[in-house]
């Protein structure tokens, strides 16, 4: 059975990816499960540049290690707020300076939107997936979902900006959604549904 190696050290992101891809006839592994200790510097100027770089570095490492029957999947995701000209964007995970500090990032976002009216608080979550096959073929998929940023945290599910991102069709924030609800409509869910079509053809 082929292995799909997730080029991420973010445990919550890995959990989501595994949940959405769990019905595929493929073994899904994290970097930790494959004993890969690589931190890829995300210095690209777009989500795609970062996702591709992560996937490519792990791909090259696995080729050099002599691995067979594998695919590498990387995800670069973030929040783009209209009023803030697309911020935090590619800096979503480190918006407040420290990587992965959800509380500080949310605090900074709310501060930057202080006094901004609801109609100007539109935002979208973006997920860019980049995948390399064992033979070096490259695939990319993008998923997006629109909503708006509320004025205080609501819900303790998900991670990142989920408790601030209000999704009108369900009348809830992403932080209030059950994992299966979120995965069915989120930016990552949308992108992975498209990627599944590709995977079913090549595995």
Model-derived segments and their meaning:
Residues 2-5, 11-203:
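Anionic-ligand binding patches
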């Amino acid at each position: 059975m082929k292995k799909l190696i997730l080029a991420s050290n973010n445990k919550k992101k890995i959990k989501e990816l595994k949940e959405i891809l769990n019905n595929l006839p493929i073994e899904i592994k994290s970097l930790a499960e494959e004993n890969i200790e690589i931190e890829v510097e995300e210095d690209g100027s777009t989500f795609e540049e970062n996702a591709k770089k992560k996937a490519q570095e792990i791909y090259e490492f696995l080729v050099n290690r002599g691995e067979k029957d594998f695919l590498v999947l990387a995800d670069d995701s973030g929040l783009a707020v209209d009023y803030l000209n697309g911020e935090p964007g590619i800096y979503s995970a480190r918006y407040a300076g420290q990587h992965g500090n959800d509380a500080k990032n949310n605090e900074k976002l709310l501060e930057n939107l202080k006094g901004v009216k609801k109609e100007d608080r539109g935002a979208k979550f973006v997920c860019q997936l980049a995948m390399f096959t064992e033979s070096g073929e490259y695939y990319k998929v993008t998923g997006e979902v629109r909503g708006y940023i509320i004025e205080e945290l609501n819900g303790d599910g998900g991670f990142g900006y989920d408790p601030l991102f209000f999704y009108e069709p369900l009348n809830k924030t992403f932080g209030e959604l059950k994992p299966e609800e979120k995965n069915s409509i989120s930016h990552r869910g949308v992108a992975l549904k498209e990627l599944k079509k590709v995977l079913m053809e090549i595995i």
